A protein has these predicted regions:
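Active-site segment of SDR-like NAD(P)-dependent oxidoreductases
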Residues: 9, 76-77, 117-120
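Rossmann-fold scaffold of SDR-type NAD(P)-dependent oxidoreductases
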Residues: 6, 68-73, 113-114
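Conserved glycine-rich Rossmann-like NAD(P)H-binding loop of the short-chain dehydrogenase/reductase
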Residues: 25-35
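Short, conserved active-site loop motifs that form the nucleotide-linked donor/cofactor pocket
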Residues: 46-48
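Conserved cofactor-binding/catalytic machinery of classical short-chain dehydrogenase/reductase
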Residues: 56, 69, 95-98, 110
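Conserved Rossmann-fold NAD(P)-dependent oxidoreductase catalytic core, especially the SDR/UDP-sugar
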Residues: 97-120
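NAD(P)H-binding glycine-rich loop region in Rossmannoid oxidoreductase-like domains
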Residues: 51-91
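N-terminal Rossmann NAD(P)H-binding glycine-rich loop of SDR-like oxidoreductase domains
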Residues: 3-23
Length: 120
C-alpha cells in the first residue's frame, strides 16, 4: 500500500504516518520546504519525505508515481493575521484543489481532507 500525507508534521498527520508504517505501507509525506518540525516524523526506510508546499503539489506526482490513498491535512496561515486573510485562504483552497488533482493523477482510490482549521 502506498499512502500520501500532507500536514504530516502536525499531530494528526505524524500519527497517521506512524500507523501506516506499522502496517507496512510505503508513506510519502509532503512537507513544506521551510518546515522546522521534521523531528516528529519517524525514522523508517518506507517513509519518504518530499519537500513540497501546497503551491506545488502537482510537481510531486512524477516522484510518487502512484498511490492508493491521499490524506490532505495541511493548511497554511493558522495564526490570527493570516486566518482572516482572503489571499492566504484562497491559496489554501487552490492547494487543496491541487491535492485532489494530484490524488487523481496518482490513481488514488481514496482521498480524505480533514483537520481542525475550521474551528479557529
Amino acid at each position: 500500500m502506498r499512502i500520501v500525507i500532507t500536514g504530516a508534521t502536525g499531530f494528526i498527520g505524524s500519527n497517521l504516518a506512524k500507523l501506516f508504517l506499522k502496517k507496512g505501507a510505503e508513506v510519502f509525506v509532503l512537507v513544506r520546504p521551510e518546515s522546522t518540525h521534521l523531528d516528529v516524523l519517524p525514522k523508517d526506510e518506507k517513509l519518504h519525505v518530499v519537500s513540497c508546499g501546497l503551491s506545488n503539489v502537482m510537481d510531486c506526482v512524477s516522484y510518487i508515481k502512484e498511490a492508493d490513498a491521499f490524506f490532505h491535512l495541511a493548511w497554511g496561515g493558522v495564526n490570527r493575521q493570516e486566518i482572516d486573510s482572503p489571499e492566504v485562504q484562497a491559496k489554501n483552497v487552490a492547494g487543496s484543489l491541487d491535492c485532489i488533482r494530484a490524488a487523481k493523477a496518482l490513481n488514488c482510490r481514496m482521498f480524505m481532507d480533514a483537520g481542525s482549521r475550521v474551528e479557529y
